[in-house]
Amino acid sequence: MPMDKTFNAAEAEARLYDAWEKAGAFRAGANASRPETFCIMIPPPNVTGSLHMGHAFNNTLQDILTRWHRMRGFDTLWQPGQDHAGIATQMVVERELARAGNPGRREMGREAFLEKVWEWKEQSGGTIVNQLKRLGASCDWSRNAFTMDPNFQRAVLKVFVDLYEKGFIYRGKRLVNWDPHFETAISDLEVEQVEVNGNMWRLRYRLADGATYRHPVAFDEEGRPTDWEERDYLTVATTRPETMLGDTGIAVNPSDERYAHLIGKEVVLPLVGRRIPIVADDYADPSKGTGAVKITPAHDFNDWGVGQRTGLRAINVMTGRATMFLIENPDFTEGCAPSEEALALDGLDRYEARKRVVALAEEQGWLDGIDQDRHMVPHGDRSKVAIEPMLTDQWFVDTAQIIQPAIDAVRTGRTEILPERDAKTYFHWLENIEPWCISRQLWWGHQIPVWYGLDIWPARFEDDGDDTLDEVEIFELLEDGAFNHADPTHHCAFDFEGVSEKFLDDLASLPHPLNNARVIEVASRAEAIDRLAQALADYNLNEDPTHLVYPVWRDPDVLDTWFSSGLWPIGTLGWPEETPELARYFPTNVLITGFDIIFFWVARMMMMQLAVVNEVPFKTVYVHALVRDEKGKKMSKSLGNVLDPLELIDEFGADAVRFTLTAMAAMGRDLKLSTARIQGYRNFGTKLWNACRFAEMNGVWEGHATQAAPPAATATVNRWIIGETGRVREEVDAALAAYRFDSAANALYAFVWGKVCDWYVEFSKPLFDTEAAAETRATMGWVLDQCMVLLHPIMPFITEDLWATTGSRTKMLVHTDWPSFGAELVDPAADREMSWVISLIEEIRSARAQVHVPAGLKLPVVQLALDAVGREALARNEALILRLARLEGFTEAASAPKGALTIAVEGGSFAIPLEGVIDIGAEKARLAKTLEKLEKDMAGLRGRLNNPNFVASAPEEVVDEARTRLEQGEEERAKLSAALARLSEIA
């Protein structure tokens, strides 16, 4: 069946992918012919996710490496999977429930809600998998993993228990990012900074005990104070006046002469009456604001640091919903007598409380002033609500105890991070690491394997010494009720059975009948109190210890998604079981990831794998940059510049999208993506398709069979292209081995479009009518086969379709052996001759174009001087040169005729007479005018780029665009100058 005129990507892509899957082409070990393994882990996209350009870029690079290694015979595994994405998934499902008019999460209860989440996951959670298939991702989908799969859950819980028992996980009170909408702690990655128009309120805090001081109010030209006033207050500034209710100190810089003498004194907090100290800390900058800073350790990360250094209390004055928590808050009321106005703020939303505090400050005279202020406010990236730094009880990993192996592994080269600058980011984060908050107040996720029990033996309670509680003692225990208020005890275990044994050990040391109690699981502390009290009361009536129960309840929180995804490499390979896959593929070879999650994910995987199995998770980390729009701007919905990879695939085909991303994947440099580039690379695929159709029309595919070695060739053109094929194979392999994806793509582009389609196809046309026809058919078939093979990792669909429709194939292209030939195929004589021919044709074409010779006009050429090698090359290829350079013929002369353009090539020179062909004077004037305008434009660009204010204040993408335009202008100026110089030779 003859080839179609064009490649129909829309029809072929689904058909080809289905064929690959049915053939098991992507399964681990498929096509393996050597002992080496290659394993790469997909960064698991969120189960809620849809394919965006970052995914498309990242997975294209992974697929290239996977297909390349698979074709080279490596035992290859590209491990796919999805992340359960705790907060994102819970948000989606809650929104769906609300849209359908169903009860909310809290009304449903945990178990029923989680059933709904699993239903949603089964119905809608596979969207991104199908989208990755459209991109051509050759993952082993039979091993598709999910971070909530039972085996993965076992791994996560085991690691938590192990790290807890080693003392690396603990429960503590620290400041976290708190999302009031979802009522949970969130990671830094889930926080986005939003610039807002706001106010800076200046507040006056009165010095305690009637103290006063002299405050400078006028200064000379050198900044020295010239006048003072007596003050009995300090002025502080804040964008969040409602937090003043939790202030516990005022910080001043010890070098600030205005306030240094006040250090150690106190101010009285308005509304609250709390006396708070003035402390010395370098965080207070004398040059900013008033120089005195209100410190609220429980509601500001910087203030928390000051509080830790200076010993200030931390008082939380908000609930998880960001409403004011005052009246029943013992921390707030301790040591002070809040005013009625302060207590009236209890229960108000933080923003309403802000208005009331400002109004009260104005009424009572402690509002010093208001300044308009544009500043950044952190928001939850999903809730779009301003987050609150919140002091809460959370679970933490004591990262300081486990980071050193992760640092050492990169420093010693066990794991390499590329580009090198990203290794610095990695080190910076690890060397300045804080304890990692791993608990989230959500329901969807890995529930923390910790159970709590009541402290049923209060410290102040004693029995009569007979190790048995009688009726009176049990009644006293109930009446005392101390276990209602004491902090609960807790144990950590893999499951309830394991934790029951630990609680039973605790109970064994208690008097009878408590030591006979059965451990049962209940939902909450409140239920535990009720069940225990009822059990003790019942025992007093029936004295039957078999009915005595000790209720425990599981921590309701779940683990941070990054905790489970931090175990992705070993968890997907079957750990903690000793699976064959774990033994064979771990540690993995390379991780390809974006720079934005180096510290959130990459560093944590390094930390976790080394802490758990004492091995690095991967040998190389390749960090790619961002995909931006064609002007260098970050893609965002608000700017309307988002490119949807699926829409691009629909319009241009997956191969064009993949090749574009690959060709632009310069290490460490952001991509500037445009549809024009994608269209251009679609044309590249069309060029290869047309070359194969040309081959078909000339009988190349008749009886053609796949051959690893090139055919024996005698024709110079055939010997030359065989050598070029050997060269490009070496270039591609060297580039991919060094993760220079752009170099591989650009080498293939230059070879396929330039050497094969532009030159070899043209050179071969006359040979099909000579005795070299059979050899040329064999050579062209072999060369085009190699084009398909070498391009397949980047453009899998069109190459697989071409492979199936050309010649006789024993197996699919996806499993065809990668070539091993190289520069040994180069024939020096053929290479020298054809390079000379191409150089002459290109020089003539360039000269014609520069001086605007009409494209279809054939010109005579005068041979001025030529060595013996050149004469032989010209004699053998004269017809080709005349046809491809659009020449009438060659003559010889000792000197160039008047009005001729000279051309130099290796071993000689030629002249092209132009008198009467073009108006040389008019052409020079046109070029000069164009050059003058270009110089003017470039001068403007240089002026902007030489202006420090422009470079410092303009958006990065605007500066980059100016630099790009200047570079393009320099290139254009060089071309115009060269053309003018050529014309100046003539007249």
From Swiss-Prot:
Protein's GO biological process: valyl-tRNA aminoacylation
UniProt-annotated location(s): Cytoplasm
UniProt keyword list: Aminoacyl-tRNA synthetase, ATP-binding, Coiled coil, Cytoplasm, Ligase, Nucleotide-binding, Protein biosynthesis
EC number(s) recorded for this UniProt protein: 6.1.1.9
SUPFAM superfamilies, alphabetized: Anticodon-binding domain of a subclass of class I aminoacyl-tRNA synthetases (SSF47323), Nucleotidylyl transferase (SSF52374), tRNA-binding arm (SSF46589), ValRS/IleRS/LeuRS editing domain (SSF50677)
Motif segment ('HIGH' region): 45-55
GO cellular component: cytosol
'KMSKS' region (motif): residue ranges: 634-638
Catalytically driven reaction(s): tRNA(Val) + L-valine + ATP = L-valyl-tRNA(Val) + AMP + diphosphate
Signal recorded as keyword: no
Keyword rRNA processing included in the entry's annotation: no
PROSITE patterns associated with the record: AA_TRNA_LIGASE_I
Residue ranges that the Swiss-Prot or TrEMBL entry lists as coiled coil: 917-987
MF-aspect GO terms: aminoacyl-tRNA deacylase activity; ATP binding; valine-tRNA ligase activity
InterPro entries reported in the protein's UniProt record: aa-tRNA-synth_I_CS (IPR001412), aa-tRNA-synth_Ia (IPR002300), Anticodon_Ia_Val (IPR033705), M/V/L/I-tRNA-synth_anticd-bd (IPR013155), Rossmann-like_a/b/a_fold (IPR014729), tRNA-bd_arm (IPR010978), tRNAsynth_Ia_anticodon-bd (IPR009080), Val-tRNA_synth_C_sf (IPR037118)
Sequence intervals crossing the membrane: none
PANTHER family referenced in this protein's UniProt entry, alphabetically: VALINE--TRNA LIGASE, CHLOROPLASTIC_MITOCHONDRIAL 2, VALYL-TRNA SYNTHETASES
Domain remarks: ValRS has two distinct active sites: one for aminoacylation and one for editing. The misactivated threonine is translocated from the active site to the editing site.
Subunit structure: Monomer.
Role played: Catalyzes the attachment of valine to tRNA(Val). As ValRS can inadvertently accommodate and process structurally similar amino acids such as threonine, to avoid such errors, it has a 'posttransfer' editing activity that hydrolyzes mischarged Thr-tRNA(Val) in a tRNA-dependent manner.
Family of this protein: Belongs to the class-I aminoacyl-tRNA synthetase family. ValS type 1 subfamily.
Protein name per Swiss-Prot or TrEMBL: Valine--tRNA ligase
Biological source species: Cereibacter sphaeroides (strain KD131 / KCTC 12085) (Rhodobacter sphaeroides)
